[in-house]
């Protein structure tokens, strides 16, 4: 049925995955995410950032947790992509990251993101209040979706082993930054050097968003997103494919917001999230079983795999 809508679209939004930097998240390791995009009539492409040009029709360029730094030539490509004043629609750079992603070894890409007011951190966000965790696991956090970009209310959005993203400014010249997904004020950051009995708690941004208007009406924008929870997109996590959690709805709504598409123009398989409820369709026993499988087996394995990929690729540099 979705194919019928493609006939009526002037253009099909394209999400292009960049390769060439030993990315942990690619089209082959994030089939749940790419399947979600395809089901909602987004076209998925892949290109090599070093040897290829960025696809001209790309609405979103994904950097799926790169593990090596970008060259000045590659960053010039990204600058040209985002800075094209003749663009017919909004464009977005979507950067995925995770704890211990090795940003200290990527100074060029870090500086590029800093110009957009965002700095990925290498620590892990943990939760001190068990009421804000799933099954008392401090690394499985019930996160809050702010109304700065998305206007709906989302329930059961869980972020597992996420890294914080520091906003360097709220507004600077023509760039504004926003916190889209964040923790409660009882979260704290991991410290590998020592375990603190009373850690300092605060609210931390997990997904940050920067925007620059490219026209006088604010209808065409250049956007940069830094998402500290790359585990969401890895096939082993299953978070995007499980309707118990709100991750799928948040992700799809954000992608549609970034591309300027709506439910009526793109796709038919849009599951609207219940607002102001905690309505989980499964029984408590079934939900408990799903949760335990996800967060004691599936997600830890997924994160370990991502970590192993990063380690092995860096070892062979």
Region spans (language model):
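Short, surface-exposed patches at the edges or C-terminal ends of soluble domains, predominantly
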Residues: 1-317
């Amino acid at each position: 049925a979705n194919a019928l809508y493609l006939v009526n679209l002037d253009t099909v939004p394209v999400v292009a995955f960049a390769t060439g930097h030993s990315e942990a998240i690619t089209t082959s390791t994030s089939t749940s995410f790419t399947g979600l995009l395809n089901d909602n009539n987004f076209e998925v492409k892949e290109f090599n950032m070093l040897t290829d040009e960025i696809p001209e029709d790309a609405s979103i360029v994904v950097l799926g947790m790169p593990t090596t730094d970008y060259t000045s030539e590659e960053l010039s490509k990204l600058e040209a992509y985002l800075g094209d004043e003749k663009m017919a629609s909004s464009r977005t750079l979507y950067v995925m990251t995770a704890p211990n992603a090795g940003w200290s070894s990527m100074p060029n890409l870090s500086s590029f993101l800093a110009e957009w007011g965002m700095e990925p951190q290498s620590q892990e966000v943990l939760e001190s209040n068990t009421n804000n965790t799933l099954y008392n696991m401090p690394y499985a956090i019930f996160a809050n979706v702010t109304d700065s970009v998305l206007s709906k209310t989302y329930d059961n959005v869980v972020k597992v082993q996420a890294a914080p993203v520091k906003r360097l400014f709220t507004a600077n010249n023509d760039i504004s930054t926003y916190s889209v997904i964040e923790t409660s004020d009882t979260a704290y950051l991991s410290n590998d050097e020592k375990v603190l009995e009373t850690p300092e708690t605060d609210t931390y941004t997990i997904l940050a968003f920067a925007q620059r208007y490219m026209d006088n009406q604010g209808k065409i924008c250049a956007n940069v997103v830094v998402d500290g929870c790359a585990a969401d997109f890895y096939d082993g996590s299953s978070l995007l494919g499980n309707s118990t959690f709100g991750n799928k709805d948040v992700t799809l709504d954000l992608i549609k917001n970034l591309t300027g598409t709506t439910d009526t123009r793109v796709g038919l398989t849009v599951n609207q999230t219940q607002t102001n409820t905690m309505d989980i369709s499964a029984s408590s026993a079934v939900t408990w079983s799903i949760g335990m499988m996800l967060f004691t087996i599936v997600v830890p394995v997924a994160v370990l795999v991502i970590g192993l990929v990063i380690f092995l690729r860096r070892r062979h540099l």
